[in-house]
Amino acid sequence: ESVLTNIRGIKVVYPSTGADLKGLLKAAYYDPNPVVILEHKGLYWSKIKGTEESMSVEPSADYVIPIGKARTVRTAMPKEIEQGNSLGIITYGRGVYWSLEAMEGYEGKIELLDLRSLNPLDHEAMNTLCKKHGKILLVTEESIECNFMLGIAGRLQRDNFMHLDAPIEIVGSVDTPAIPLNSELELALLPNGNSIKEKIEKLLKF
């Protein structure tokens, strides 16, 4: 993601559901600019536990999602927001399902935003989330160092500094020289519900 989004002149989208894939694919067809569509193989056929929501009824033939428009997956309860007991999670692709796994037990306290489009970004939706909750967690599959979300974190902290109650946190893959071929080691490398839950606990204590 960090490589593609730095190539001038192209748009980058990353759907997390079958319906979003169709809507963004049609938007890419109609867009005069080159569009790169990323797909996470872990979401194919939704065979992995926790990714069932990526399956969806096929939308109508004219279903198009505007590129650059994020999707709210889960919302927080107004009471929790008013009491300062809520936070917002911003992610995309498979990160949506890792986040949903981590959110179990925090019903009504977390709002989950699926970016869907990495370039252009939905800055309005992200800034609204910052002002609404004051605590933000970014989830990405990229390694922590030099990842796509670092740029988003810097921009959000600059634009919403007076509204934040805690530093913006990022969850990503473990920094390693290479991705292991062993499936168990690969799972240990990637983000998961537990690693995200640790950051949720940390932010909610602020």
Task: Name the predicted role of every residue range.
Residues 1-31, 173, 199, 204:
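Conserved thiamine diphosphate
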Residues 41-42, 46-206:
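Thiamine diphosphate
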